[in-house]
Amino acid sequence: MKIDILSIFPDMFSGVTGSSIIKKAIENERVAVEVTDFREYAEGKHQVVDDYPYGGGAGMLLKAQPIFDAVQAVKDKQPETKPRVILMDPAGKRFDQKMAEEFAEEEHLVFICGHYEGYDERIREHLVTDEVSIGDYILTGGEIGAMIVMDSVIRLLPGVLGNKDSAVTDSFSTGLLEHPHYTRPADFRGMKVPDILLSGNHAWIEEWRDKESLKRTYERRPDLLKNYPLTDKQKTWLKEWSDSK
């Protein structure tokens, strides 16, 4: 996969691309990440990327020209692919695991990271394929949001995680929150690991994990259960918890 990031603050990405899983993914050629300062594509001596909005109003808007030209430049470097051009924007579709899995199937992603009051609307209408938000709050720019999406996508690529099952069993990947985890020692200052995890009975352990995953979802994110295909056993567990309230 190729990921291009367009930002007027490219140095923000050096820590993300130079450490942990993303660094290893780049070194192992599972993904290539290139960060471009789209100010370099702004016309004029001063390379201005923002301007006042027509009709007045607070703040400045990112101009269409530098971003259009920067996107075209990264497309020209990889003409054999048709990239998803992703605009990081609080008005976009809420990012979730399903979207991460969808993006992970692509060959080329281009992230546009904005600043100031917003974007010239022609960028939305004629350039981007996806508008993505990471939540109902406002950040200084789109860079942190792009880092979150990029991290979530890269870890899903084949060969990136040491254990291929890790991404599959994470919270949200199955539609439910992940079950609790424990490691050694079995007794830490009187706080003990559930006996069933020490039993060696894999069938019991899997059922315990399934039940705890459902319980955690029921208690913390009941909205996720609205369209979840519950088994008869899971329905019984939910009824037990509901009746005990």
Curated annotation (Swiss-Prot):
Q: Tell me the keywords, alphabetical order.
A: Cytoplasm, Methyltransferase, S-adenosyl-L-methionine, Transferase, tRNA processing
Gene Ontology MF annotations: tRNA (guanine(37)-N1)-methyltransferase activity
Any one Pfam family here would be tRNA_m1G_MT
Under catalytic activity, the entry for this protein gives: guanosine(37) in tRNA + S-adenosyl-L-methionine = N(1)-methylguanosine(37) in tRNA + S-adenosyl-L-homocysteine + H(+)
EC assignment: the record states 2.1.1.228
**Predominant subcellular localization, coarse grouping:** cytoplasm
The record ties this protein, via InterPro entries, to: Alpha/beta_knot_MTases (IPR029028), tRNA_m1G_MeTrfase_C_sf (IPR023148), tRNA_m1G_MeTrfase_TrmD (IPR002649), tRNA_m1G_MTases_N (IPR029026), tRNA_MeTrfase_TRMD/TRM10 (IPR016009)
Q: Can you cite an annotated GO cellular component? A: cytosol
Note the coiled coil stretches, chain numbering: none
Q: Which GO terms describe its biological process?
A: tRNA N1-guanine methylation
Where does the UniProt annotation locate this protein? Cytoplasm
Residues binding S-adenosyl-L-methionine are G114, I134, G135, D136, Y137, I138, L139
Q: Which CDD domains match?
A: TrmD-like (cd18080)
Mind telling me which HAMAP family this protein's record contains? TrmD
Identify the NCBIfam families for this entry.
PRK00026.1 (NF000648), trmD (TIGR00088)
According to its UniProt entry, the function of this protein is described as:
Specifically methylates guanosine-37 in various tRNAs.
Oligomeric state and partners? Homodimer.
What's the family? Belongs to the RNA methyltransferase TrmD family.
Name of the molecule in the record: tRNA (guanine-N(1)-)-methyltransferase
- Give the organism the record lists: Listeria innocua serovar 6a (strain ATCC BAA-680 / CLIP 11262)
